[in-house]
């Protein structure tokens, strides 16, 4: 029988990406979290702010971690608005597909951008690369260069 998530024996998909076992397009990395582009974006530049700690639901995380993730999400959102000329940055916490605390942060032009049925499930890799590069550049311009990985 497989170990449960809470026992920490079987790593989540996000833990495997963070460890480098699975590739990811990282745009932020610090001691508590990473941010990377999703492979099914609602809009170009859609990022996931992912806790390094394996916590399933955000309501189970400690307050300091939740606060840190929100601060990082705010920086990512501001960079998305700049990089993609978006009027707003949206944020969602769902957690149904991967049982590992993560926030969806994406440039938004309207309420339809919050509908996961509108996600692009087959984006061109070159488009994802370009979006990651644009977001990294905006984060560096905002003064976060020390937290922005090269890829």
List PLM regions with ranges.
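HIT superfamily nucleotide-processing domains
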Residues: 1-151
């Amino acid at each position: 029988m497989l170990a449960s998530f809470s026992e920490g024996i079987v790593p989540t998909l996000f833990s495997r990406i963070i460890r480098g076992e699975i590739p990811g397009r990282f745009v932020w990395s610090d001691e508590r979290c990473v941010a990377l582009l999703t492979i099914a974006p609602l809009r170009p530049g859609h990022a996931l702010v992912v806790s390094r700690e394996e916590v399933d639901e955000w309501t189970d995380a400690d307050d300091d971690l939740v606060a840190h993730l929100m601060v990082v999400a705010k920086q990512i959102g501001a960079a998305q608005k700049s990089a993609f000329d978006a009027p707003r940055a949206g944020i969602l916490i769902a957690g149904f597909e991967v049982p590992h605390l993560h926030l969806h942060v994406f440039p938004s032009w309207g309420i339809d951008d919050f509908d996961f049925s509108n996600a692009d499930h087959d984006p061109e890799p070159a488009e994802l690369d370009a979006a990651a590069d644009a977001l990294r550049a905006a984060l560096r311009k905002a003064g976060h260069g020390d937290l922005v990985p090269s890829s």
